[in-house]
Curated annotation (Swiss-Prot):
Pfam families, A to Z: Fe-S_biosyn (PF01521), NifU (PF01106)
Keywords: 4Fe-4S, Iron, Iron-sulfur, Metal-binding
Gene3D superfamilies documented for this protein: Fe-S cluster assembly (FSCA), HesB-like domain
Cofactor note: Binds 1 [4Fe-4S] cluster per subunit. The cluster is presumably bound at the interface of two monomers.
Cofactor: [4Fe-4S] cluster
A Gene Ontology biological process term: protein maturation
Entry protein name: Fe/S biogenesis protein NfuA
Family to which this protein belongs: Belongs to the NfuA family.
Organism ancestry: Bacteria, Pseudomonadati, Pseudomonadota, Gammaproteobacteria, Vibrionales
Assembly with partners or alone: Homodimer.
GO MF, one example: iron ion binding
Binding annotation for [4Fe-4S] cluster: 151, 154
Alphabetized HAMAP family for the sequence: Fe_S_biogen_NfuA
Amino acid sequence: MSMITITESAQQHFGKLLAQQPEGTNIRVFVVNPGTQNAECGVSYCPPEAVEASDTKIELELFDAYLDELSLPFLDDAEIDFVTDKMGSQLTLKAPNAKVRKVSDDATLMERVDYAIQTQVNPQLAGHGGNVSLAEITEDGVAILQFGGGCNGCSMVDVTLKEGIEKELLAQFAGELTGVRDVTEHARGEHSYY
């Protein structure tokens, strides 16, 4: 698990802010609504009395950063940076796993494929108001997907599925997945019109 990265410039920025706070004050990094589409990463001051026994402490040169137990898995690979450009300076927080908990390498194929869909496929479909979810993985390794939102009934679903999603998932899960199908295509039987 690669922990959160707080860049040198961000550490200097927090160091200056903390110098104006009561002694012993550090920072807390957290995620509000973790594991949901509304997840947001935040930073706040953390006075000594606010430190919990279950917190994870990251010791830095100028201060310590505390992460609460609930936020911890969602802050994996997160980065806090302090960027200065022509427009001024700003703190940037990137937490790629805030909306979806990162799965471990030994997770089931279903969990790993679902994670890939939530973090790689759905952000691309969101621009069209669409989404896709994993319905099942068949015994012969075919991932059955359920399209929703703007994708449902869209004539481009087949192209999106074959050219985009299937290529991406088969490359990522080579040797584990044999194909990717739309749930309606998979469910087609003698009762289907075409």
